[in-house]
Amino acid sequence: MLIYLFEWLSHYFKGLEVFSNYISVRIIMISITSLLITLALGRPMISWLQKMQIGQIVRDDGPQSHFSKRNTPTMGGVLILSSVIISCLLWGDLTSIYLWILILVVIFFGAIGFFDDYLKLVLKHPKGLRAKYKFALQSIFSIVLAIVLFYLLSKNGQMSLSIPFSKSLYIPMGIVIFVVLAFFIINGSSNAVNLTDGLDGLAIVPVVLVAAGLGIYAYIETNSTLANYLLFNYLGNPGLAEVAVFCAAVCGSGLAFLWFNSHPAEVFMGDVGSLTLGAVLGVIAVMVRQELIFFIMGLLFVVEALSVMLQVGSYKLRNGKRIFRMAPIHHHFELKGWPETKVVIRFWIISLILFLIGLAAIKVR
């Protein structure tokens, strides 16, 4: 919205055209805007959640240190999502269909997560939205979205799977493989981030790092000069560059949310935040054709999800025997005696290393 205002004002005031003509400037401005919105609305929202008694439910069989988290305000993810949408409407190019798709993903998965949280925290339904209904909604949306993305991206022939650390190795994909891969990436990422969000600040930092990494790839691949210089396939789809702007909004809002979510957490994002942010990252990875880079940068999420799958499989197939003391795996380390802050910071370090490996693939090819 603001880019049109600055474009008009630039006819009367020299220099204002940088806010409408340069995506790099808008990336900076949207990250600052989303950060300030989240910081400004954070305290009032926490107070409102406390007043409405929308608080965290803690498992009785979990680490004893978690008992103090009981009734901590939850559903703070609404704050992140609202900030991202408002910032995108202000600084995004509203003619970009890719920007609107990402906003739609935020709204749809946010609605699923919100309803799940509402059932658990407000109506006191012990399990919230049933897993089969949640999975069905996610699946239908992901499949439809994957088909839409296939036809949008295929207009410029960008239907190959990019192989990291390779200059010219790409795997072509037809619609079936593309849709299946996109389905698993979007749904898997959504649920993996949701499983990771179990300790103060644990999930939001990896989310910010992965969003930043994918944003960098989006900026490079939609800039013909940078793409040619770094030997990337140039993604010339009109409006696709707005993916980088969207990523910046996620980073700004996520960092501001960490202000309130760091130990001891004043608010948790809830399913409304974690399910949505995970889905958004998956969609972005598909849009910029960097699914394998996303796997590298988001490997922490993969490990968290695999730990749950292995735990459940072991319990069912080995007569109740478990691999971990508790799953997801961050709880396993807590029950081994690691303080929560040590688990979180070490997982952050791992996520940072994975982020740097993913960035290294830009040049080491």
Swiss-Prot record:
A Pfam family that the UniProt record links to this protein: Glycos_transf_4
Necessary cofactors: Mg(2+)
GO CC field: plasma membrane
Membrane topology field: Multi-pass membrane protein
GO BP field: cell division; cell wall organization; peptidoglycan biosynthetic process; regulation of cell shape
Keyword match Cell division: yes
The protein's enzyme class: transferase
Cellular localization per UniProt: Cell inner membrane
Transmembrane segments: 22-42, 74-94, 95-115, 133-153, 168-188, 201-221, 240-260, 267-287, 292-312, 342-362
UniProt keyword annotations, A-Z: Cell cycle, Cell division, Cell inner membrane, Cell membrane, Cell shape, Cell wall biogenesis/degradation, Magnesium, Membrane, Metal-binding, Peptidoglycan synthesis, Transferase, Transmembrane, Transmembrane helix
Family recorded in the similarity comment: Belongs to the glycosyltransferase 4 family. MraY subfamily.
Name listed for the protein in its UniProt record: Phospho-N-acetylmuramoyl-pentapeptide-transferase
Species for this entry: Francisella tularensis subsp. tularensis (strain WY96-3418)
Lineage: Bacteria, Pseudomonadati, Pseudomonadota, Gammaproteobacteria, Thiotrichales
